[in-house]
Amino acid sequence: MARCQKVDIAAQELLGVRMYDLRVRFDRHKKPIICHGLMEYETINLDSWLELMNRTYDHYMRVVLETTRPDQKQEIEFILFCGTLEHKYPNIKFFGGNNRSDWSCQNPIYDFKQKLPQIDHKYSSTTTLFPNAPAWLTRIDDLYPYLYARLHNKQNYANPTPNRWLMLDFVNIH
């Protein structure tokens, strides 16, 4: 979502997208901020987007706390936020519950109890090529997802891994 896509949710749905990536952190008033790396997005109406997805039973959503270091206040708000999502939108299959620095989800902050779908992470250069990349390298990568999509999406669409979900930035580029 946000700057990793150039088309809105309705267009993504028409392109066949059924799995989304929701990254949040919380402001000092405990309000969720939709974000990705250093970028924050205030124009997204999260409730209307989730209500639309909740009308069907075929959507997955990874929920990630977008902080790079442990922060107890952020984690408490994240736990409350995730619990609210599960309760309010029971038809969406939520997963993740991890901090941005724990992509293995070995120690999630919130346990959605949803079996982690098998995912082909083909949406950025460092996370695809270097799963254990240092934090500074993944921050640099946040600046260039469009370039990666231009160079690799066509091949990634053409060669998906069987029985896995394909996660891409800029789904309209293929």
Language-model features, listed with the residues they occupy:
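Catalytic cores of phosphodiester-bond hydrolases, prominently lipid phosphodiesterases
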Residues: 1-174
